[in-house]
């Protein structure tokens, strides 16, 4: 159910809930009448946000960048990705951002407790080559900054990328046959 590996692949986890809540919030907004009229453009923006984040991560990991340079690049790529997602569907992005913080703040707290208590779970596991820099710098680097700044971008981008096509399909199903032909 849980893993002691770094970034452990566990059945219990917050990441796998993102597509579910992306669909949930998108459908709720759709039924409330707050959805894009057309879905091609929002889908392109959402896909562009994901492509940017993936490309940025690839560059950061393959270039052997210093932590400060990676952090700076990651902030910039994250900000641009969030803007693209917000352009895709602003209210869905806001809902997913709020959900992202509501789900990630408790994770950061649990990770703090795990690191302090040495629980030997994925919450306190470090890469073998991670430098011995003390508790607070380690906590900020591996928990606080990722959970509070970067995982929300994942939540907004992936949640939107999953929610937008589902609502596009619902919109097509909702149309009457005469509207669909027009």
Predicted regions and their residues:
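Cytoplasmic juxtamembrane regions at transmembrane-helix boundaries
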Residues: 33-44, 165-182
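A glycine-rich, hydrophobic loop/mini-helix early in the fold
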Residues: 29-62
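Central hydrophobic cores of alpha-helical transmembrane segments
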Residues: 95-106
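Hydrophobic alpha-helical transmembrane segments
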Residues: 135-161
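Hydrophobic cores of alpha-helical transmembrane segments in multi-pass inner/ER membrane proteins
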Residues: 13-26, 76-85, 153-166
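Membrane-interface helix-boundary motifs at transmembrane edges
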Residues: 2, 29-40, 87-95
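Juxtamembrane non-transmembrane "cap" segments at the membrane-aqueous interface
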Residues: 106-134
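Alpha-helical transmembrane segments and their immediate interhelical/interface regions
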Residues: 1-15, 49-92
